[in-house]
A protein has these predicted regions:
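Gram-negative and organellar
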Residues: 1-262
Length: 262
């Protein structure tokens, strides 16, 4: 399989968009691929010929009755005007069990440290994400996720900020739990709780969110959505209420929308 142009590869989605060539070959349940091209500009997401990147990956896929999974391991080097900007390895896994349990996980290990002149320095975990979702039945599903992120250091692109970024090399962590309930056709109820934290107690926050939706209102038609959000951080506390009603005025041509936020 060959792809030319800008595309996000679902097997290595943590890399983001790739401008260039992607090629992949399968050998039974195993697959291998190469990437050669450029990454979008960090400031405006446009094509930038100075930001060359290349890498390769291997993976294993499995599909049986009641089980489906993809697991990928790869390495990538990103340059800026011919100089090493970032060098790292990445891992990604996704699986579905019995059409009810979904698991997704990924991590990135940075290997290059220009400051210490190590072409392969001490591995630095810059990104870890784990998501588990479970569908109890057609009416109820919930999910739980954890993420830990450090600032990604591009040694050439962000050279004026390297010392500050490495001095602030603290993982921002977060957990999130969500639940969605569909008690009847056209009715949805749900909520989520998320918490952000880091080891020095800065940038902490707690967020609670809940919603009620009617996708088809009897007699008057249209859609109704009500939402409540409460956020508490080191600096402020907010409570936001919002409601929205929308419906078609001229079918397939004109919609009307009323929104109120408090």
């Amino acid at each position: 399989t060959f792809v030319l142009g800008r595309k996000i590869n679902p097997k290595v989605s943590s890399i983001g968009a790739i401008d260039g060539l992607q090629a992949e070959k399968s050998f039974g349940n195993f697959y291998t691929g190469i990437i050669a091209g450029f990454r979008p500009d960090i400031s405006d997401y446009n094509f930038n010929p100075d930001l060359m990147q290349y890498g390769a990956y291997v993976g294993l896929k499995s599909q049986t009755k009641g089980f489906y999974s993809h697991t990928t391991l790869g390495a990538m080097e990103q340059n800026n005007s011919g100089n090493v900007d970032r060098r790292y390895t990445y891992f990604q896994h996704s699986s579905t069990i019995a059409q009810k349990l979904n698991i997704f996980s990924s991590f990135e290990l940075d290997l290059y440290n220009q400051v210490t002149a190590d072409s392969v320095g001490k591995p630095r975990l810059t990104n870890l994400y784990i998501l588990v979702g479970y569908r109890i039945n057609r009416m109820v599903d919930f999910s739980l996720s954890y993420n830990s992120r450090k600032q990604i250091v591009y040694y050439e692109t962000l050279k004026t900020d390297i010392e500050r970024m490495l001095d602030d090399d603290i993982a921002r962590q977060g957990i999130r739990a969500t639940v969605n309930i569909r008690p009847a056709n056209y009715i949805g109820i749900g909520g989520s709780y998320s918490k952000r934290f880091q080891s020095n107690d800065l940038n902490k926050s707690d967020n609670l969110n809940g919603y009620l939706s009617f996708s088809k209102i009897p007699w008057i038609d249209g859609r109704f959505y009500a939402n409540y959000n409460r956020n508490i951080s080191n600096y402020m506390q907010t409570n936001i209420y919002s409601v929205r009603y929308s419906r078609p005025i001229i079918k397939m041509k004109l919609d009307g929308d009323i929104y109120y936020r408090l």
